[in-house]
């Protein structure tokens, strides 16, 4: 049961962090939450079986049960560890790079949402959740790229990324 709870924590912590950072937009608080996520993710990756599967009941429709199912095989666990490490490094770098930006809290919210979307995309075993996570990753990419929306270059780059993501969506 402990491993299931840890997995649920790894899955939900970035989303909860986005909400908490939206309420308390302090860089050190955001970095601390990412550190907790990183440690939890690394601990999960080192203690979970190589082929970890879990399903949570989502809803019943006409006597049929639809589950939110997740699967963490060895490659997914490795990539989860990399996502945790890279997101922590990005947060550390961002603290000094964006130190004087008044909108740093918004940036950290977008970053936590992006990490949550990536984690969900990586670990889901459900096509519906996969598609939703795919769309969320695209939306968060757009928001992060257009963070400095006052600059023309950022706006143009965000539009370009949005269009490229749409082509990827068509292929999906």
List PLM regions with ranges.
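Bulky hydrophobic/aromatic packing residues
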Residues: 14-17, 69, 88, 115, ...
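Cytoplasmic juxtamembrane interface segments
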Residues: 14-28, 144-155
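Transmembrane helix-loop-helix hairpins at membrane boundaries of multipass inner-membrane proteins
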Residues: 1-6, 16-109
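Alpha-helical multi-pass transmembrane bundles of energy-transducing inner-membrane proteins
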Residues: 107-172
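Generic alpha-helical transmembrane segments of integral inner-membrane proteins
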Residues: 12, 16-19, 85, 89, ...
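Generic detection of intrinsically disordered/low-complexity segments and helix-coil linkers/edges
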Residues: 9, 37, 50-53, 125-128, ...
